[in-house]
Amino acid sequence: MKIPIKKLRSNAELPVLQTKHAAGYDVHACLDSNLILEPNKVTLVPTGLSFEIPQEYHFEIRPRSGFSTKNQILIPNSPGTIDSDYRGELMIPLFNLGNIPFVIEHGMRIAQLLIRETHYTNWELVSEFTDTTERGTGGFGSTGH
């Protein structure tokens, strides 16, 4: 599959797979100078990239596991969704869960991008469901530990 990608700044880096069978493409910060993530705040980090995602697909943006666990940096709306009709710059929201400022440098791998198929549906309004289940309406802990 080919997905058109545009570099909005010359120093932007294309997403890359780190291993042959990786599912997520690493996304890099695109910065002119270091960016400070203050504790307990969300900061939008630019990637310098925009995409022409095919209509039947969307992107999911997820944290990189090592980056998150080692640095206490999260993506607050994980997974983030990038719709096929969005043409602006891919920005990654990062939340510093730690107690000290964290420095983001140009080229740092800050997130993973996954390409997902989008499924469209026609909702069918009903007054009752025809299929009952053992679980029924039980939620939040109803299936035990």
Swiss-Prot record:
Annotated Gene3D superfamilies: 2.70.40.10
Pathway(s) the chain acts in: Pyrimidine metabolism; dUMP biosynthesis; dUMP from dCTP (dUTP route): step 2/2
EC class (word): hydrolase
Metal-binding keyword on record: yes
InterPro entries the UniProt entry points to: dUTPase, dUTPase-like, dUTPase-like_sf, dUTPase_trimeric
Enzyme Commission number(s): 3.6.1.23
UniProt-listed Pfam families: dUTPase
Molecular-function GO terms, alphabetical: dUTP diphosphatase activity; magnesium ion binding
Swiss-Prot/TrEMBL keywords: Hydrolase, Magnesium, Metal-binding, Nucleotide metabolism
GO BP term, example: dUTP catabolic process
Official protein name in the record: Deoxyuridine 5'-triphosphate nucleotidohydrolase
UniProt source species: Leptospira borgpetersenii serovar Hardjo-bovis (strain JB197)
Native organism taxonomy: Bacteria, Pseudomonadati, Spirochaetota, Spirochaetia, Leptospirales
